[in-house]
């Protein structure tokens, strides 16, 4: 598919899926390669024929929606953000939880892909923070709608490249190496509860102290759907809870109900 055909097709098909073209501009070739493979599977001649297929068969839109999912994941991705979480955000949340006499600090990793993000939190807590907060459980819920990615997350076996941003001493403590594959230690695997859910529909139960929703809703979703997600996130976060989004993302309609923490990082505190 030529680039101009790719652009034209995505600009046509993304809005009915509740997605926005601007979020896909940089990753369009990846998505269009998937669409091309699907077109060939169906024995269709070109993009126009696949477009006609979508018009004739509403069920094909579900398959197309899956082809438009983008997941780029590694441990400790955006190191400055994780450093802020470990050095400031999580200790403060843990202290507040202790003052409330809570027994658990709850975190949700939305769109967790193959598990690197929630496992990074688990490693950070157990290695650097847990000893300072005895008696406080760190509960991590991680959700994604891709069963293949979730299976990889539960297996917790990663190539060396996935760990390149993780502090070296943490890596040695958290993983067992088998050649070029790194196995996360069982206790850390058990510390994350994975579930198959689409953020556009079903969500985990309960309220959270920390939510990471990075490079997902506020990149790829249409503006009206972004507003719905943000409202629901606000309802699920405790007052004073923390929302982390992607480094190139912005909250829709400004930061209403949230206050951005300093240093220019995409870390927000719920203020109302």
Q: Each PLM stretch: what is its role?
A:
Residues 2-108:
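Conserved AdoMet
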Residues 101-120, 139-141:
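Conserved class I S-adenosyl-L-methionine
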Residues 114-132:
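Conserved SAM-binding loop of SAM-dependent methyltransferases across substrates and taxa
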Residues 239-247:
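Conserved beta-strand signature within the Rossmann-like core of class I S-adenosyl-L-methionine
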Residues 252-272:
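Core SAM-dependent methyltransferase catalytic element
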